[in-house]
Amino acid sequence: MENEFQDGKTEVIEAWYMDDSEEDQRLPHHREPKEFIHVDKLTELGVISWRLNPDNWENCENLKRIREARGYSYVDICDVCPEKLPNYETKIKSFFEEHLHTDEEIRYCLEGSGYFDVRDQNDQWIRIALKKGGMIVLPAGMYHRFTLDTDNYIKAMRLFVGDPVWTPYNRPHDHLPARKEFLAKLLKSEGENQAVEGF
């Protein structure tokens, strides 16, 4: 199922290596020259993504199939913008602190856009631009952070397996089982890729 719904996915999900600038976090932060990353690289890191139809999400069969297959039993919708999110400044700061969760983080962009930053296997930041229609799953145990872009607005569906628990563990929390399991999967994936390349 992870490979379904790929048509036009790069129009709603784009990724690149970030520079080290301390400028406004809402800027793209491209390196010079720009280093874009294919979605397959994100998949290797454990990040799953789809392109869906956000204008009819209530009746979207593909969304229903994903939810059933992955056990996403709870959803809610949140607007992240200064006008609609209570304690906006505090929340945005906490979202941008590097952290992990012991469960997947699943977000489906219904309107607007934003950035998820994730670490690659060499601890380099990759910026993932999520636009309207993009759905992304960050694996449990992956260090990441979130920020709006300069448009300052995203309307996102949050999906959960069971109760809606969003507990961030700010880095470092390498002792957590979710982190150890994530790293083990990453090493296994790297080993398999090297074996194929060496064949």
Curated annotation (Swiss-Prot):
It is an enzyme of class 1 (oxidoreductase). One of its GO terms (biological process) is L-methionine salvage from methylthioadenosine. InterPro entries: ARD (IPR004313), ARD_euk (IPR027496), RmlC-like_jellyroll (IPR014710), RmlC_Cupin_sf (IPR011051). The keyword Cytoplasm applies. GO terms for cellular component: cytoplasm; nucleus. Its EC number is 1.13.11.54, 1.13.11.53. Fe(2+) binds at residues 99, 101, 105, 144. Signal peptide: none annotated. Pathway: Amino-acid biosynthesis; L-methionine biosynthesis via salvage pathway; L-methionine from S-methyl-5-thio-alpha-D-ribose 1-phosphate: step 5/6. It is found in: Cytoplasm; Nucleus. Its main location: cytoplasm. The keyword Nucleus applies. GO terms for molecular function: acireductone dioxygenase (Ni2+-requiring) activity; acireductone dioxygenase [iron(II)-requiring] activity; iron ion binding; nickel cation binding. Binds either 1 Fe or Ni cation per monomer. Iron-binding promotes an acireductone dioxygenase reaction producing 2-keto-4-methylthiobutyrate, while nickel-binding promotes an acireductone dioxygenase reaction producing 3-(methylsulfanyl)propanoate. Induction: By low levels of ethylene and submergence. It catalyses: 1,2-dihydroxy-5-(methylsulfanyl)pent-1-en-3-one + O2 = 4-methylsulfanyl-2-oxobutanoate + formate + 2 H(+); 1,2-dihydroxy-5-(methylsulfanyl)pent-1-en-3-one + O2 = 3-(methylsulfanyl)propanoate + CO + formate + 2 H(+). Keywords: Amino-acid biosynthesis, Cytoplasm, Dioxygenase, Iron, Metal-binding, Methionine biosynthesis, Nickel, Nucleus, Oxidoreductase. Its cofactor is Fe(2+); Ni(2+). Ni(2+) binds at residues 99, 101, 105, 144. Belongs to the acireductone dioxygenase (ARD) family. Catalyzes 2 different reactions between oxygen and the acireductone 1,2-dihydroxy-3-keto-5-methylthiopentene (DHK-MTPene) depending upon the metal bound in the active site. Fe-containing acireductone dioxygenase (Fe-ARD) produces formate and 2-keto-4-methylthiobutyrate (KMTB), the alpha-ketoacid precursor of methionine in the methionine recycle pathway. Ni-containing acireductone dioxygenase (Ni-ARD) produces methylthiopropionate, carbon monoxide and formate, and does not lie on the methionine recycle pathway. HAMAP family: Salvage_MtnD_euk (MF_03154). This is Acireductone dioxygenase 1.
